[in-house]
Amino acid sequence: MKAKIAIICSMLLGVFSLPVHAAEVGVTNTEIRIGQFAALTGPAAELGKRLQQGILAHFAAVNAASGINGRSLKLISRDDGYEPNKAIVAVKTLIDEDKVFALIGSVGTPTTLAAVPAINAAGIPLIGPFTGAQALREPFNRNLFHVRASYLDETERIVQHLSTLGISKIAVFHQNDSYGKAGLEGVVRALAKRNLNPAATVTVERNSVDVAGPLA
């Protein structure tokens, strides 16, 4: 997680290595406003909070070193509770009311997918979304800057490793939304390359803490 946060922030700083003028939305003579929409409450809150804390720590270090061209970085975080409808509201608030210059560190496939139309309409960059879904990589989106591997790559490596251990009966326990289905797709593709099928598939609802029930 620390490495991912460092990469995300480094990409953001790369954006600011270019000349930034006060006339830009989210940029004043003294600060640059950056927005984050993520789960800060609910079962997935630890992911959102850790990203938020890491970004804040990195921003503090940059600001202590005179910021970006004399401007301090300010993070504005909006809670989406890991729910798509709330993510849409959060990102629109960041864009329309908070007037941020860029977005950073969203958490989750369903929430990021839901926010993409508003991101594209505003032409605002989203740096380091915490998701590996192929739907956010293909077709190419000039507003999205990824720093992590795709779920297809990750699941291929998982199945590859299990195969080296002689394990061929592989079941998939996945979240019943775009995030879980992206992971399922990756496993199915990886198994198909080895002439295998999932031994079983079981789903759990997003934000549910009852994982024992579906497995019973």
Each model region followed by its residue ranges:
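Short, low-complexity disordered leader/linker segments with a strong preference
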Residues: 1-33
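Cofactor-binding loop segments of dinucleotide-utilizing enzymes, especially the Rossmann-like FAD-
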Residues: 39, 80, 175
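Immediate post-signal peptide segment of exported/extracytoplasmic ligand-binding proteins
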Residues: 22-36, 67-72, 163-168
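Short glycine-rich His-centered loop
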Residues: 38-44
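Beta-alpha junction/loop-to-helix N-cap segments that form part of ligand/metal-binding clefts
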Residues: 31-33, 46-53, 61, 65-135, ...
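Extracellular/periplasmic Venus flytrap/periplasmic-binding protein
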Residues: 89, 134-135, 142-216
